[in-house]
């Protein structure tokens, strides 16, 4: 049985978000719907989830001492990581002391870098993956590329949104790719993974919920990537029954091996009936923002329901839907959005994240749309996103 207290009262149930971006903001809103007290933590002030939290803190979450201090001060009942760049050793220690880390500290530690989760998937679970090698020096990087072959992809073992990633076609690109990978890691320079290129028809995110009443799957989410980050996503992605069954089997193995309750974003390559594991995030996924319009329970609502120990029951998918990012390029600490009235309409919504500033290219919002089919939904979402004019 789940007992929930009322926010700001002595018996309050407290949730601390480690990472307060747009995904954390939606988790915070779902917690607010249940009267939960929300504490948002990030490395910069006025992050999106801080706008809808009861309190907020600005710290370097890779600093073990600072992380322990804020958790000890706030005494949350649930610690909910939104990003990878966290001192996960400290989370394991705190979990050992009785704190509840979502979905569990082991999952956050294994998935904070690509090495932990790749070794779990390929070497422990025996799941199909791309060929890969790890390297921690430029010399071993050259050896790894030689072993994997061209073309290949290099990524920092700890990065997100395409930072530090390069597609390598020839030896002439190696020096530049190594340097870029060293600059792009979330925790600074360090180890990289070199992956062989997988031939696939499309990529999916299989949003998978591990809850008290078992493992549940959302309809597969298709997406288009550019520069290592998603541009559009849609649901449902059409695929064969056999491929879907295999995708669900892989996702089930991964989330049960990681442990804990919550929603996981399992990324997979699909080629015909074959399915290859790519990555997993033990939290809501950016491509899953489409579920804000496509399902009765969004990925954020499912995450909260699961980690609070509530049954999921069933997930209702309404029909074809899509999301398209609002991705301007400018420099400003006073961003405004014009022409929003022309973007919204029947079956079309806009979410603006409330990020405090932009310096270059940054995702500041998302358009959501339904349609008679996925193709129409994508067109409607992209058109809506393009109509929003970002100024600063």
From Swiss-Prot:
Name this protein carries in UniProt: Formate-dependent phosphoribosylglycinamide formyltransferase
Positions that bind ATP: 114, 155, 160-165, 195-198, 203
EC number: 6.3.1.21
Organism: Salmonella schwarzengrund (strain CVM19633)
High-level lineage: Bacteria, Pseudomonadati, Pseudomonadota, Gammaproteobacteria, Enterobacterales
One Pfam family linked to the record: RS_preATP-grasp-like
Statement: the UniProt record of this protein carries the keyword Nucleotide-binding: yes
Boundaries of every ATP-grasp domain copy: 119-308
One of the protein's GO biological processes: 'de novo' IMP biosynthetic process
PROSITE patterns: ATP_GRASP
Chain's role: Involved in the de novo purine biosynthesis. Catalyzes the transfer of formate to 5-phospho-ribosyl-glycinamide (GAR), producing 5-phospho-ribosyl-N-formylglycinamide (FGAR). Formate is provided by PurU via hydrolysis of 10-formyl-tetrahydrofolate.
Assembly with partners or alone: Homodimer.
Positions bound to N(1)-(5-phospho-beta-D-ribosyl)glycinamide: 22-23, 82, 286, 355, 362-363
Gene Ontology annotations for the cellular component aspect, listed alphabetically: cytosol
Pathway in which the depicted protein is active: Purine metabolism; IMP biosynthesis via de novo pathway; N(2)-formyl-N(1)-(5-phospho-D-ribosyl)glycinamide from N(1)-(5-phospho-D-ribosyl)glycinamide (formate route): step 1/1
Binding-site residues for Mg(2+), renumbered to this chain: 267, 279
A molecular-function term among this protein's GO annotations: phosphoribosylglycinamide formyltransferase activity
